[in-house]
Swiss-Prot record:
Pfam families in alphabetical order: FBPase (PF00316), FBPase_C (PF18913)
Primary site of residence: cytoplasm
Cellular component annotations (GO), alphabetically ordered: cytoplasm; cytosol; nucleus
Nucleus in keyword set: yes
Positions contributing to Mg(2+) 3 binding: D121, D124, E283
Keywords assigned: Carbohydrate metabolism, Cytoplasm, Hydrolase, Magnesium, Metal-binding, Nucleus
Record-given protein name: Fructose-1,6-bisphosphatase, cytosolic
Lineage: Eukaryota, Viridiplantae, Streptophyta, Embryophyta, Tracheophyta
InterPro entries according to UniProt: FBPase_C_dom, FBPase_class-1, FBPase_N, FBPtase, Fructose_bisphosphatase_AS
Amino acid sequence: MDHAADAHRTDLMTITRFVLNEQSKYPESRGDFTILLSHIVLGCKFVCSAVNKAGLAKLIGLAGETNIQGEEQKKLDVLSNDVFVNALVSSGRTSVLVSEEDEEATFVEPSKRGKYCVVFDPLDGSSNIDCGVSIGTIFGIYTLDHTDEPTTADVLKPGNEMVAAGYCMYGSSCMLVLSTGTGVHGFTLDPSLGEFILTHPDIKIPNKGNIYSVNEGNAQNWDGPTTKYVEKCKFPKDGSPAKSLRYVGSMVADVHRTLLYGGIFLYPADKKSPNGKLRVLYEVFPMSFLMEQAGGQAFTGKKRALDLVPEKIHERSPIFLGSYDDVEEIKALYAEEEKKN
């Protein structure tokens, strides 16, 4: 009997243990972040359970309301939003919440306030629920740097000021990918234990990938650099093999694959959406934060994505993120275009 292997299997690094270990590196820490994260983790477990039984519990149908983005809300969207708002408020560690589903920011009542602001998309890719495609929750965390009354300005900060970001993907397995600014780590939910276990320590994206991920249905509306780049992916002139196209249409699934296998995810501006489609605070920033922490890059077509300073909580931006070398290529095409102009 292999006792060493058995011991290894029973010495599980749960997400709570992992975050506590990180916390111990900072003697001045009071554990507020650990408590906040435990509430986010609970929200993810709740939503994972709801997603898994959505068809059976009739949570799939439209709720008959339209959210701030003009998208009809599904019941599961509404439920997920309620779960995360309640989990974050009850943690006693937040002051401002921004959700994709709510038109205005939520300001926590004074007695329950803490030093963090959380921006999140409670259920990204929810149009894919009916067909069982992977969907997910995306979140980013800022620190409140004053004790005055919180305002929207507390979250309208560049992404480089985030202290943590992550996503939870509800697919063939439930996986939570997290960065607190010291690398990227992946935790998989063990359903028998009800715990997220560290399965992907220190994720590093390959420097170059052979996959590109974009909605080619919008190709006729793209600008020059995006058109040239995708053409180059499909018909390389330097003798290298063509890249493969992989596009799910659920940002969490597409970015997750890009993070693990390498390549590039593109959601460019086009004639229909001149400012891009993805929201800066709770889609572009968290995913860009994770990509950079894993050794990749994130670019808006004009600048480093994390250097953007949003002016509105639901502001949108184009985004190109993924392997370092692949993003370098599209940056070069935009630089070329700028020289011409």
